[in-house]
């Protein structure tokens, strides 16, 4: 994992709407807080993104700007996750922006990686330390991190307003990339759209949106597919609960008069809303209930969408739910894997037995962690891979398996765990390694970051990630961890059990 101590020099780029000044350090140019859409405020927070207006003079792009209104997410229980959620909410209406890292040598032919951050549709930003794109730029890629609307402005179903405004933001950012990225040395005809968690759900949604056709040429989906997307009816349940908490009518005008602070605070009540009934239900890991709204989930529409024909890299982590369960004490003491499975399927006992057969040495805590993670991410990811492969697109599947010693070894290869290695992050970054952090105190394999980051770079450059494609004849899954092993038919029986449950 890498870092640099070089001194920065000022650099300028001319765009159709005005000039921006960034910085160059260690062979990498950096431009932060560059707007791709107009500022949003009042009722405009619930409208489609609008084009950027021009400015006079030179706009400072050396410091990251405002971020979408959001609650603090710097910790999950006992675990410090600040590298993925700092700086939190930086106030300001002008937060529909991108952060760009580009090689000094880029001449308009460099491949482009557009990355959409996660955070449960309610937190996070492109300015988080974890999403520094310098390592990609050092390897010849123009990296673009996207800020988009979160929470109610981004995803609440509001009569008279377009649904999925946060996704519309990302599509607008892709249009901006098509028109402007050449000025930063990138090739608009070689764009990979990537995302993790909620960001991966947005990627899946974009691949199924006809208005986005041609804006990306490859895609990466890390730990998210849209399997938990709301139907329009579920979106109405959440929206009604939200308006009731605020004590207002569910209209654009009424919501437009509510402050950002009040919108953020009201979102907390949704963490326990059961979208099937509207009643209260204990959430998994205090996950707030915002999601894209789709009449049919992306996995069910990808075969008929433009995204079904592009190259896709998709996967999950072995113990996704460890992030939500271990630091909050939900794996301490007696746990019930049947109850965990029952949150997702009716045939819970049959499903748990399939897991006991697959993992005969696992205890109840380990089974609960794995089943919950597969219910949240794994089963949906494999279903999306199957549908994408059937549509004719080239599909590559991975499973990240490296386990740190964090949370007394209960965290496992959890949600977020692959990100430090994908981004080849500085191992000494505050909050990343040590007691109470994601990576803990155990050292990963010395080449894990270079190999995993290198696989992502190779995919973005059009060479594939370095392992064979996932096909109907050989459902090959690349296991990535202490060892790298290409596994045919890996966990097919378990995911078939999900389909039957």
Language-model-detected regions and their locations in the chain:
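Non-catalytic accessory segments of hydrolases
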Residues: 1-164, 431-452, 458-466, 494-501
